[in-house]
């Protein structure tokens, strides 16, 4: 186990952790945002990032510092912390971003790691190759080999107390991402950035981003702190945390502000289009859109950048509380409704339900069924997987609430879509206490039918009758042929007809009583 990263709480694959950074003498609570600081541009000073926004860690570019005579001399003379006036942890990039943008840089892993150590970096980065999406597999494999060599060079370097990143690349090839994650995890390096996802996010390919991160996570150990390089828009943070990412960096707060763009948890707005500011941060409570538009360009940029940071840090606090409360999935689902591409990302997340289920706590807060995607949550998959723990004997009635006929049954179990069947003794256990709407969708019934099928498969000697409340044909088609089907509404109509014919003479056909 890595002794510098401690997991304190979790929900889905998301976690609250403590990252110890020995060279800085600080411990950073994760999930954490690393504001990007350009040493040439002072949009918001690092001292203010720390004192006003609560930043515990930031990231800057050691290659920019190294290639600027003035910055290099100052950093070597007084150290990075004094130069930036920041007491928290400082991560530095190696120039890999410049390599991706311009095709080459004038440094090596050995040189840049030594320079990062000399200027007082707390978490350093080797020179990896950020392979963009959709390249030929041969290029992705060749780039990955160069990155592997960079990790080997980083392992061999004398880094002292400085933590070192082990980037995970692999383009849009899940098997290469997983392989890269496994290789990085086997090194003695410390933090694991998933790289080259910015082009996916810029193109709103959140589903591809999810697949890349999920593949990398399969290769990495649970105790590996994961950094999603270049991610920092508040709209996608809950999704990324649910995947198991712990650290985020982005210059978006400043770059977007420079273009008059205003970040929200639902997307990006242009200041020129706003009549109201839908936020309660200090900037939005003091200024109106007209006030901001009347400011000079530099002042407007600074105020927008401050808002953008406030909303991003607030979202991380909201995510942490959701993890603590056990309702991170509800927050992810809410954010998924902000943009069709985010919904694609959410559905991609649910496609990795078996992977999520392995890390998701077995018991937590209330389960709210909010959409057809809720039918595919880890809790449903876990209930189906655990059908092998349930023993059914004799003739078992599986019912949504009523007794279908006068038949005698050896046992009566409840059926609740999307989970399916379970003994009534489990009715008050999580997640079977789920809040489910009266009008369910097809996915919920089809998942319940899968649960019935699993129970029948695990108990071949038992006989089953399913009393359903008008399930759709697509769901009933998934129920094994050996299960007798009865519609509760049809039985209710039949009993009503019999009661009408019999008048006051009584009803010998039974009644639809509660299964609870």
Curated annotation (Swiss-Prot):
Its EC number is 2.4.2.48. Disulfide bonds: none annotated. Binds 1 zinc ion per subunit. The keyword Metal-binding applies. Keywords: Glycosyltransferase, Metal-binding, Transferase, tRNA processing, Zinc. Its cofactor is Zn(2+). It catalyses: guanosine(15) in tRNA + 7-cyano-7-deazaguanine = 7-cyano-7-carbaguanosine(15) in tRNA + guanine. Pfam families: TGT. GO terms for molecular function: pentosyltransferase activity; zinc ion binding. One of its GO terms (cellular component) is cytoplasm. Residues 488-502 have a biased composition (Low complexity). GO terms for biological process: tRNA wobble guanine modification. Zn(2+) binds at residues 279, 281, 284. Residues 488-516 are annotated as: Disordered. The active site is at residue 93. It comes from the Archaea. Disruption phenotype: Mutants lack the archaeosine modification, but do not show any growth defects. Exchanges the guanine residue with 7-cyano-7-deazaguanine (preQ0) at position 15 in the dihydrouridine loop (D-loop) of archaeal tRNAs. Belongs to the archaeosine tRNA-ribosyltransferase family. This is tRNA-guanine(15) transglycosylase. It comes from Haloferax volcanii (strain ATCC 29605 / DSM 3757 / JCM 8879 / NBRC 14742 / NCIMB 2012 / VKM B-1768 / DS2) (Halobacterium volcanii).
